A protein has these predicted regions:
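Short, surface-exposed amphipathic charged segments that create phosphate/polyanion-binding patches used
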Residues: 13-21, 154-156, 216-220
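Residue-level "edge-of-site" marker
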Residues: 36, 65, 204
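Mid-to-C-terminal alpha-helical segments outside catalytic/metal-binding sites
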Residues: 164-169, 175-221
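Catalytic pocket-lining loop regions of alpha/beta-barrel enzymes
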Residues: 29-30, 42-170, 178
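Conserved beta-strand termini and adjacent loop/short-helix elements that scaffold enzyme active sites
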Residues: 2, 97, 142, 206-207
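Conserved, mostly hydrophobic/aromatic
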Residues: 23, 52, 139, 173, ...
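Ligand-binding grooves and catalytic loops that recognize ribose/phosphate and carbohydrate rings
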Residues: 14-21, 25-28, 66-84, 183-196, ...
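Mid-domain alpha/beta scaffold segments of enzyme catalytic cores
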Residues: 1-47, 51-55
Length: 221
C-alpha cells in the first residue's frame, strides 16, 4: 500500500488512520515505495511516519538527490535527514532503496556519484554507519542501485551481507516478469561457491521478508 503526505488536508494534522486501516484490512503488509518529492524530515512526512509507526507497517523509501526533476524523498549528501527520522521513529522499520542511499555505502561518494552507480573499492560510508547505529534501518537490495552496492567491491559485498544478514532483503524492484534481474545469478553464485554462509543466504533471499511480513516461515518459500 502507499500514502502521500499531501493527501487529505495537505497539513501536519492530516489523519491517515482510516486509510491505513483500509490498507491493513485489505491485506497490505508494507507501505511503499514511498517517494513524495519533499524533504525527508518535512513535517508532512513526520506526520505520516508517526501514524505508520503506530500501525506497525514497515516502509520502503526512495531517496531523491534534489527537489524537482526527480521523484523520492529529498536528502543531502551524508543523509542527515534520514538519520533524524531513524532517531525520531525507532519502532518504524525503514527499508532503504535507490541510488542516493546505496551510493553512500562508500565514504568517497560525491554529489554527482550519488545520482548514479559509483564503481571501485568501498571504504565503509554513511549507509554502513547508519545501519550499525540504527537497528530500524534495513536494506532493500533490489534494482541496479542495490546490486551495484554489493558488487562494486566483491569482498566488501560478502562481508556486508554477513554483517547485516538479519536486515537485508532480496527484491525485484518492480513486478515485471521479463526484466533483467542480475541479483538472481549473483545470489546463486553466492550459494554455489559458498561466498556467504548458508544462514545468511536463507535469511536474505526469503526468511527476513517472511518474518517482516508476518508469513509462516515453513510455507513462505
Amino acid at each position: 500500500g502507499n500514502v502521500d503526505p499531501r493527501m487529505l488536508t495537505n497539513s501536519t494534522k492530516s489523519d491517515f488512520r482510516q486509510m491505513l486501516t483500509y490498507l491493513r484490512d485489505a491485506g497490505a503488509k508494507e507501505i511503499g515505495e514511498y517517494f513524495p518529492n519533499i524533504p525527508f524530515d518535512d513535517p508532512l512526512n513526520l506526520n505520516v511516519f508517526r501514524q505508520i509507526e503506530e500501525f506497525g507497517f514497515p516502509l520502503t523509501f526512495h531517496i531523491a538527490p534534489a527537489i524537482g526533476g526527480c521523484y523520492g524523498v529529498f536528502d543531502e549528501l551524508g543523509l542527515p535527514r534520514l538519520e533524524r527520522v531513524l532517531r525520531e521513529f525507532p519502532r518504524l522499520i525503514f527499508l532503504a532503496h535507490s541510488q542516493p542511499f546505496w551510493a553512500e555505502i562508500s565514504r568517497d561518494v560525491t554529489e554527482e556519484g550519488r545520482r548514479g552507480y559509483p564503481t571501485g573499492p568501498v571504504t565503509p560510508g554513511r549507509a554502513v554507519e547508519l545501519m550499525r547505529r540504527y537497528p530500524n534501518l534495513h536494506g532493500d537490495l533490489s534494482a541496479r542501485s542495490g546490486y551495484n552496492a554489493l558488487t562494486r567491491d566483491p569482498e566488501f559485498g560478502y562481508a556486508f551481507l554477513e554483517e547485516f544478514q538479519d536486515r537485508l532483503y532480496f527484491g525485484t524492484d518492480i513486478a515485471n516478469v521479463p526484466q533483467d534481474l542480475p541479483q538472481v545469478p549473483y545470489f546463486r553464485k553466492l550459494k554455489v561457491e559458498r561466498l556467504i554462509s548458508p544462514e545468511a543466504f536463507e535469511k536474505i533471499t526469503w526468511r527476513n521478508a517472511a518474518r517482516l511480513l508476518g508469513l509462516p516461515q515453513e510455507t513462505a518459500r
